[in-house]
């Protein structure tokens, strides 16, 4: 649930570590994302009675460790979550159909069991039938709400348990918002219990240590500004509840070491992080990049985005080139696209030294509007005359690639209005810098 791969990425980045749950007996309060835990428990049991027993046992165990438990409970409809609900209904129906087919097979199979260990085999199949029947029952969201509300009545008179209803906002969002307030009062975050990976995005909002738990594991999370950036970048690329992500891209533990991470979640930094491979513009579509980045930023910072209109999905290419369009359009005022490359270069370069008369004559000799082929030695000579180098550059201003003049950002990648080339794959690019 939530942001795909975020937990594994934070583990890979070493800010999230797994602890031995048995070594930690006492907490300064416990906050629970109720629905996520309830569903996790429901997937492990066979009937409502067992679900009730196990869930109550968990809560009572948390009370012993935390003194007081606050159960954050989703309530009401979240308007901006309609697309997510539609997808979940579709997925739920598909899952229900698959489980019903599996149930039919098990029902048929149990009737035909005979011979050696007949009773044991039937008992095993019956357990599977019971579990499938219960899972089909819970595939109806109304049944989930009814059964959860029934279980919660067991805590109505329990002074150690608070039921906190989150009207028209996600429980994990409200939980982390309240946990942040709790920190300002007590100087410590409560233990956060959730299976939703959005929780780790919200928990990265400050650099104070947190303890986060799901049903089976306990984590310590000490986020840096870089981890907060990584969490936001993962929400942007891989998607979250309110933004489907950048189609055609994914951040995984495998490619994380190729991605530059920063402290500030800015458009320039985001594009630099995404530039781990070459991209080519496939359409002329542009997207409102600032709106997307603002939404992710506000959501991650626990600002109330529930009145926003969530941004639509776009491809990673549309995001990248829309983000770079402003810089390219600014550059076009000093760019002559229709003349040969040496002339383009002379027009675009800002002199970094005085150019003497003999050098002007040399430059003049390079002006040949009929010759469309570029000579590497000519390119290097022009660069040198203007005070630039082609080797060992600390700052790269331009790159020359197949007669294309490309801009460079952070010396990390090159681009124009139709292609982006990463600096890690730039053996056939001539650098111009200083």
From Swiss-Prot:
Pfam families: Pox_G5
EC number: 3.1.-.-
Gene Ontology CC: virion component
CC cofactor note: Binds 2 magnesium ions per subunit. They probably participate in the reaction catalyzed by the enzyme.
Superkingdom, taxonomy of origin: Viruses
Signal sequence, renumbered to the chain: none
InterPro entries hit by this protein: Poxvirus_G5
Enzyme class: hydrolase
Chain sites annotated for binding Mg(2+) 2: 196, 198
Binding site for Mg(2+) 1: 33, 74, 168, 170
Cofactor: Mg(2+)
Protein location: Virion
Keywords for the protein's UniProt record, in alphabetical order: DNA damage, DNA repair, Early protein, Hydrolase, Magnesium, Metal-binding, Nuclease, Virion
Induction statement: Expressed in the early phase of the viral replicative cycle.
Protein family according to the UniProt entry: Belongs to the XPG/RAD2 endonuclease family. FEN1 subfamily.
Protein name stated in the entry: Putative nuclease OPG089
Organism, scientific name: Variola virus (isolate Human/India/Ind3/1967) (VARV)
């Amino acid at each position: 649930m939530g942001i795909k791969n975020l937990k594994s990425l934070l583990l890979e980045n070493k800010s999230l570590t797994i602890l031995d749950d048995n070594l930690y007996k006492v907490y300064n309060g416990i906050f629970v994302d109720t629905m996520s835990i309830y569903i996790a428990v429901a997937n492990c049991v066979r009937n409502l009675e067992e679900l009730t027993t196990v869930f109550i046992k968990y809560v009572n165990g948390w009370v012993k460790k935390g003194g007081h438990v606050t159960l954050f409970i989703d309530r009401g409809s979240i308007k901006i979550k309609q697309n997510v609900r539609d997808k979940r209904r579709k997925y739920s129906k598909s899952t229900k159909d698959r489980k019903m087919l599996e149930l039919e097979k098990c029902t048929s199979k149990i009737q035909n069991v005979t011979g050696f260990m007949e009773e044991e085999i039937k008992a095993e199949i019956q357990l599977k039938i019971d579990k499938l029947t219960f899972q089909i029952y819970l595939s109806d969201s109304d049944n989930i709400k009814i059964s959860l509300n029934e279980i919660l009545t067991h805590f109505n008179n329990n002074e150690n348990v608070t039921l906190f209803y989150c009207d028209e906002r996600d429980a994990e969002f409200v939980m982390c918002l309240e946990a942040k307030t709790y920190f300002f009062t007590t100087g410590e975050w409560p233990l956060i219990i959730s299976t939703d990976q959005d929780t780790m995005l919200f928990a990265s909002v400050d650099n104070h240590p947190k303890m986060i738990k799901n049903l089976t594991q306990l984590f310590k999370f000490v986020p840096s500004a870089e981890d907060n950036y990584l969490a936001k970048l993962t929400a942007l690329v891989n998607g979250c509840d309110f933004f489907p992500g950048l189609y055609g891209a994914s951040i995984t533990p495998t490619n994380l070491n190729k991605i530059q991470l920063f402290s500030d979640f800015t458009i320039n930094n985001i594009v630099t992080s995404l530039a781990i491979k070459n991209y080519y513009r496939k359409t002329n579509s542009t997207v409102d990049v600032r709106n997307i980045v603002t939404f992710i930023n506000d959501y991650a910072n626990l600002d109330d985005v529930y009145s926003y209109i969530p941004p639509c999905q776009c491809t990673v290419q549309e995001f990248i080139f829309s983000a770079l369009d402003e810089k390219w359009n600014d550059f076009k005022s000093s760019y002559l696209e229709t003349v040969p490359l040496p002339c383009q270069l002379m027009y675009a370069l800002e002199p970094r030294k005085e150019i003497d008369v003999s050098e002007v004559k040399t430059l003049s000799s390079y002006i040949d509007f009929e010759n469309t082929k570029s000579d590497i030695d000519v390119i290097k000579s022009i660069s040198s005359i203007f005070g630039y180098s082609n080797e060992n550059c600390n700052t790269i201003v331009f790159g020359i690639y197949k007669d294309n003049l490309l801009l460079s950002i952070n010396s990390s990648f090159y681009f124009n209005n139709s292609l982006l080339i990463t600096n890690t794959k730039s053996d056939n690019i001539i650098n111009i810098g200083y």
